[in-house]
Amino acid sequence: MLITVYCVRRDLSEITFSLEVDGDFELENFRALCELESGIPASDTLIVYAERPLTDNQRSLASYGLKDGDVVILRQKEAPETRPAAPFPGLDFSTIAVPGASSQPDPSQPQAPPPPPDTSSFPQGLDNPALLRQMLLANPHELSLLKERNPPLAEALLSGDLEKFTKVLQEQQQERARREQERIRLYSADPFDLDAQAKIEEDIRQHNIEENMTIAMEEAPESFGQVVMLYINCKVNGYPVKAFVDSGAQMTIMSQACAERCHIMRLVDRRWAGIAKGVGTQKIIGRVHLAQVQIEGDFLPCSFSILEEQPMDMLLGLDMLKRHQCSIDLEKNVLVIGTTGTHTTFLPEGELPECARLAYGPGREEVPPEEIADRELAEVLQKSADEADQQKP
């Protein structure tokens, strides 16, 4: 018969595995098999089935009622506390009952009131938020992992408020303990209860997701980073523009602000107005059927669809890329114009428009997008006016 074992270690880490055994298999031998799978010594394990601990190692599994497809819980026993030979200051052992001894106090021993507990004798780690906070602040690597895996606790840690950090830590510990109790209750429930089985399935799925994410963080941390988008320098109607290269876009587009800056709004054919649909929707003002785009030393004919609200100035779509047989060479970080053989380098992040950078300036994320667009449009118009003044005789 196939028995599924849900194992909970002392550190609350979990593992699930299955064992194929006979019904007359003794519990002692079953513990040994579990030790091989889980790494937990057989003497430290407690096996629970149907909310009942299995204690007699000489009995067979079938005598406990186990059958094919059942689930048992294997828990690692708590480690016995080791105490130094010298007595701890501030701890009173006189009230501890010793098995086989009288529980009455020894009249020859003076009864002293217990002093207040000494904070130095508290368990270290999670039971001492102040110490844990100091350890995390002193370890940049652990702090970075905490920011990735537990943002609420990291935020409380960096706030500098010990009381807030303690509160968040205790809330998370209580929530984890509650989930652990719920998980144990589900695994001990009736195996024919559909609701319980559905919750167990969801719990296993979430566990697999967390395990997959942990492996990805260890083996491929670069997958959690962001890449810089592909931009090139070009000129439209003689005006410099930073163009976004997007082979997934069907058509080449330009923002209304960029079209005004390049003085091609007079060429917009409004009969081509409509709605552009992609991740979102935007209004198309019209189309410029032919304009000149300069990339390095090449002058290429191009058409644009003008969008009313577009954060980027210009986007080179697949129509433009296929027309001029362009190829994206990521190894050399260049865009190759196939019809001419010209190479142009993709821009580094520092030269990208602000809307395309991975990190905006301080406080920029708090500014509404409409206000950012208004500022950029005002800057463009002002720059255009300054250039016009400079060209006057």
From Swiss-Prot:
GO terms for molecular function: aspartic-type endopeptidase activity; identical protein binding. It is an enzyme of class 3 (hydrolase). It comes from the Eukaryota. GO terms for cellular component: chromosome; cytosol. Keywords: Aspartyl protease, Chromosome, Cytoplasm, Hydrolase, Protease. One of its GO terms (biological process) is proteasomal protein catabolic process. A motif (Ubiquitin-binding) lies at residues 370-389. SUPFAM superfamilies: Acid proteases, Ubiquitin-like. It is found in: Cytoplasm, Cytosol; Chromosome. The active site is at D246. Pfam families: Asp_protease (PF09668), Ddi2_HDD (PF24669), ubiquitin (PF00240). The keyword Transcription regulation does not apply. Belongs to the DDI1 family. Homodimer. Aspartic protease that mediates the cleavage of NFE2L1/NRF1 at 'Leu-104', thereby promoting release of NFE2L1/NRF1 from the endoplasmic reticulum membrane. Ubiquitination of NFE2L1/NRF1 is a prerequisite for cleavage, suggesting that DDI2 specifically recognizes and binds ubiquitinated NFE2L1/NRF1. Seems to act as a proteasomal shuttle which links the proteasome and replication fork proteins like RTF2. Required for cellular survival following replication stress. This is Protein DDI1 homolog 2. It comes from Xenopus laevis (African clawed frog).
